[in-house]
Amino acid sequence: MKRREFLKTAGIMGGMGLTAPSLLSSCGYDNTLKESDIKDAYQTQLLVVGGGPSGVCAAIAAARMGIKTLLVDSGNCLGGTGTKGLVGPFMTCYDAAGEKMIIKGLFEEVVNQLVERGGALHPKDIRQGTEFTAWISSGHDHCTPFDPEILKIVYEHMCLEAGVKILYNASFVKAVMSGRMIKGAILLTPSGLEKVQADWVIDATGNGCVAADAGAPYVFGDPESKRVQPASLFFRINNVDTDRLVADVVPHLPEFRRVNGVSYRCLHWRVAEAEAAGEWDLARKSVNMFRSVEKDQWVINCSRIHNVDPTNAENLTAAETEGRRQVQELMNFFHKYVPGGENATLMGTGSIMGIRESRHILGDYIMPVQSLIDGIIPDDVVLLAANSIDVHGAQGGPAGGLYMPIKKNMYGLPYRCLVPKDIEGLHITGRCISADSAAAGAVRVMPPAMGLGQASGIAAALCIKNKTTASKVDYTDIRKELTKQNVYLI
């Protein structure tokens, strides 16, 4: 490309909030990229980037309010960590006393549809301290075991029924900007580079990719330790003789380690045997395993990979490779050391890594963990939850981290957490909301992520309808619509 042609291309890209070098490097195109290479493919009122639990609920909530909504995802199904990542079960949706379901709305609809299709056990029937919660004795009351394959179908059905347009195999590349206002996004699809023009955008990528690219400030992990929580590659097994496994665990329950009054440490006695034989080198001393819908099926949350940066392809590749190595070690462990696990079969490993922490996008308000501990319900509450503060050790080895069931019955999550600083026309939702590292450790799990997604979709719809900004939208209107959509608030 001649210098004059390059400058002309760079000027075109600059008008869209892009620069040619950054776009070229993002997409793997050579230096012959022209404006015509970016197809002006879609025009929509709302663009939701990321089809995980939070993005799905954002899209459904907005579409039900009559907003033309496009939901894009880099994969070939909806559900993110719950489907592609095989993460399960859904953590608690009840208050801390275990008496009342408080995360309702779209989350409850999803659960009910799963149960109707034989794809879940209802949380009202699941108690903590049992095989459904890895025998963890607190903070896990009323979890929801589910089948990830049925969950894919339920999410897709609910989106299509609401009128959401879904676009799979569409990876976010760049934000389209006009000053501080986001106007859409460039996607990389099998068709090439495609531009989506949108009146509003919701970042549900988990890693805050859209907000960060648009110029919103953020921190990566915990600013004090300069680390992120470790990642895990989940996997599922079947052909387990669950009766024999349970019979091995129950007599050892009094030996379980107690932290902040919480009893956990499943199969630590079997891990000790494997370690003594030189057949265990994982950075854990016990096994987190959750019985699933079918009696012989279990979800394993035990692999541990430290210092994973999911925004770096090489780093993430190394983590995924190490995760699969650890899965092989764990399968050997089940076959050789766990009663009932001798004939266990590997059903599948997550096609994406279970990432606990990466970017925290910053808003004018950053939710502190102390507000959760104190049970604060803010004036602009959009979701009530009681999920425990669960910060996995980032330092390496089995030690470290923080697990603390909340001392109040519930806490409230404010609308302000969904509003990024310095960027207009954008909401954030899911794991990347404006919260400190420890607070994010509580609300990163799927039920609150779904509730926050529903709130962000409602807020975005109101901003579009009323032609206002995220910071000026009337909270009274948000609350009214949340209540209309069966969200529990007090």
Positions of predicted regions on the chain:
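N-terminal export signals
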Residues: 5-28
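C-terminal segment of N-terminal export signals and the immediately downstream linker at the start
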Residues: 22-53, 63-64
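Mobile, glycine-rich extracellular loop/lid and propeptide segments
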Residues: 53, 60, 171, 198
